[in-house]
């Protein structure tokens, strides 16, 4: 299942060296980390909802998520400072490549109305962020044990200097792009 990591070090690096005009393998952009964030909002006050979301994110990422808390009180949203509002995971190394492999080959093709990623989802510094609408598109999540279908955010951080370089890297890895 760890095919994407070895592919990245061998074939992708050689291909990107010729495409981007890099003189050394060390200049080739790489994926540094993948951050997954599941915001629950006001529902996080219920411990059952929080446990369910944390369990689902742990199944998807194969790593225990950390609970995110509100930084300040917002009366309009009825939250106070320190209230749990979601959970997040940062993946690096082998687990990161395993997750990306499952995301590219299994989850994104199963996503409803998914046409591909667009250039507007890049941040200008070579990183891309997008949302997964249904967490049940991952095979690890048992459909019978979930209480509600939730989505989560995925941020892929790379060492690329520009969005063009990052798109070239992610295209070589197999990410589907619209244009």
Curated annotation (Swiss-Prot):
Its GO biological process annotations read: translation
What are the protein's UniProt keywords? Ribonucleoprotein, Ribosomal protein, RNA-binding, rRNA-binding, tRNA-binding
Q: Name one GO cellular component term.
A: ribosome
**What Gene3D superfamilies does the record point to?**
3.30.1440.10
Which SUPFAM superfamilies did the record assign?
RL5-like
One annotated GO molecular function is: rRNA binding
Q: Which family does it belong to?
A: Belongs to the universal ribosomal protein uL5 family.
Query: Function of this protein?
Result: This is one of the proteins that bind and probably mediate the attachment of the 5S RNA into the large ribosomal subunit, where it forms part of the central protuberance. In the 70S ribosome it contacts protein S13 of the 30S subunit (bridge B1b), connecting the 2 subunits; this bridge is implicated in subunit movement. Contacts the P site tRNA; the 5S rRNA and some of its associated proteins might help stabilize positioning of ribosome-bound tRNAs.
Describe its partners and assembly state. Answer: Part of the 50S ribosomal subunit; part of the 5S rRNA/L5/L18/L25 subcomplex. Contacts the 5S rRNA and the P site tRNA. Forms a bridge to the 30S subunit in the 70S ribosome.
User: Could you identify this protein by its name?
Assistant: Large ribosomal subunit protein uL5
């Amino acid at each position: 299942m760890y095919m994407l990591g070895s592919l990245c070090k061998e074939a992708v690096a050689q291909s990107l060296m010729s495409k981007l005009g890099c003189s050394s393998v060390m200049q080739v952009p790489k994926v540094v980390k993948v951050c997954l964030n599941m915001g629950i909002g006001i529902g996080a006050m219920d411990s059952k909802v929080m446990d369910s979301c944390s369990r689902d994110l742990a199944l998807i990422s194969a790593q225990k998520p950390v609970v995110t808390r509100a930084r300040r009180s917002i009366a309009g949203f009825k939250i106070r400072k320190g209230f749990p509002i979601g959970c997040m995971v940062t993946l690096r190394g082998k687990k990161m490549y395993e997750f990306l492999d499952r995301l590219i080959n299994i989850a994104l093709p199963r996503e409803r109305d998914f046409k591909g990623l667009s250039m507007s989802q890049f941040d200008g510094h070579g990183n891309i962020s997008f949302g997964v609408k249904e967490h049940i598109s991952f095979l690890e999540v048992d459909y019978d044990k979930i209480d509600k279908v939730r989505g989560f955010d995925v941020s892929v951080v790379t060492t690329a200097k520009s969005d063009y370089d990052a798109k070239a890297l992610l295209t070589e890895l197999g990410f589907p792009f619209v244009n």
